[in-house]
Amino acid sequence: IEVSRKQGKTALAAALCLYYLIADGEDGAEVLLAANSKEQAKIAFDMCSKFSKGLDTKGKYLTAYRADILFKATNSKLKVLAADDSKLDGFNASFGLLDEYHAAKTSKVRDVIKSSMGMRENPHLCTITTAGFDKTLPCYQLRTVAIEVLNELKSDDEMFIAIYSLDADDDWRSEKNWMKVAPNLNITVTSKYIKGQVQQAINNPSDEVGVRTKTLNQWCDSATVWLSDESIIKCTQAVDLSKFRGLPCYVGVDLAATSDLTAVSYLVVDGDKYYFKTHYLSLIHISEPTRQEAI
């Protein structure tokens, strides 16, 4: 599940965890609520604790402790798990929830939860997150597979996918597109708030990535932006290099040794300076699928 901030992700995570703790119909259920740090996990756990006290005001069935919740009727337990915990083994999860997976540097915690489910008859693993700005991390890889499943390029009948995101050709500044990323628009977050955030990003390019990833749930390629894409596009034009034949030209080359692109930049001097950049991918790399997929 991928959706922007202020859409009730934490409440949904807490509700799912408590459902699988109480109503999954499995004796000795073990629910793992996982995050990238103890502080992050505590936010979701505090919501679980609050909900549990609302469900069972007298504490007859549900008992909330500092880092776990016990459901006495079936001897089931909800536990908090963080990537920075010293011990990440010995679990027997019936349900696992990964919160804000976009920030996970590795898939270690997800792998631990999945591998602990082998003895369960009906285990479930839920990943819930906003977009991020590092497409090399496990979350974006999982997202890529999910989209391939949605597009029927891959098959996985056990995978439920909900991605609330802009389409590739959508203008992130256009108010008509915001409903795509905010299913709770004007319920848990107002159009006025999003409009203010977007205007802030337009006025200050350094805020653009934060607004696009968190408010508009759009994956970006870096944590900060010095110049916006629109500013760069306005400064570009199509130029025919052959028209500069005979003029001084400086060439810079960045060769690719493994799976990267080879880049060549040309600087032609003719009173003013003209920059040109070209990328190449060698035929041998195209013929090697594993390298091609790494680009």
Tell where the protein language model's regions lie, with residue ranges.
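Carboxylate/His-rich catalytic cores and anion/metal-binding grooves
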Residues: E39-A41, L261-L283
